[in-house]
């Protein structure tokens, strides 16, 4: 019996490793990825999420466009682990990217920044080889975004016009949940209005309430029976808010 076990031990170990890898990869989706051909290797400032220059440098430039994961702007700011599958060039962990744009190319789910594309590689030389390939096979899964020592920030866009039109984006959202609704509340009279996502990551209010404002966010639990959670900032947006300004919410999504 012992001799038989020793004879088949390599096969048994190989089977265990195969099953372990299959289990580990169960949460990954198989796809393809390309990259932005821009010269500065970071993301684009003209992404569909409307992040502007912030979107090019967010997450140290490890960003991506994705038509399938953009989801009419709901997917803006979501994080994904993306790893290429060529064993000669690719690292096992790949890279964590943030969705900042919508786009697809040559049957891909991701158009990565060059910075992110090369970070999937084992080495600098391997990264150069990946760029030469242009399009590579990948696996990906959604993961939690992490922004240590940062609160959620509200960026008032330059398209805003005080006091008649308020338009803003939500930056530095941790976790892996979607913001599915936003309320704009006047903090003195406690009157609130439900806002619409106008495009990309942009929320807007025509004739917003006067006075100090609280921007409250509803996070999806992902559960079929609800369990969605409101996050209420501890800081307010001042009564005399300004187009182009950023305001710290004082709160952050707590990672599990």
UniProtKB/Swiss-Prot annotation:
Residues 46-150 form the Expansin-like EG45 domain. It is found in: Secreted. Its main location: secreted. It comes from the Eukaryota. Glycans are attached at residues 27, 189, 240. InterPro entries: Expan_Lol_pI, Expansin/allergen_DPBB_dom, Expansin_CBD, Expansin_CBD_sf, RlpA-like_DPBB, RlpA-like_sf. Residues 1-24 form the signal peptide. Pfam families: DPBB_1, Expansin_C. The keyword Disulfide bond does not apply. SUPFAM superfamilies: Barwin-like endoglucanases (SSF50685), PHL pollen allergen (SSF49590). The keyword Glycoprotein applies. GO terms for cellular component: extracellular region. Residues 164-249 form the Expansin-like CBD domain. Keywords: Glycoprotein, Secreted, Signal. Belongs to the expansin family. Expansin-like B subfamily. This is Expansin-like B1. It comes from Oryza sativa subsp. japonica (Rice). The lineage of its organism: Eukaryota, Viridiplantae, Streptophyta, Embryophyta, Tracheophyta. The gene is EXLB1.
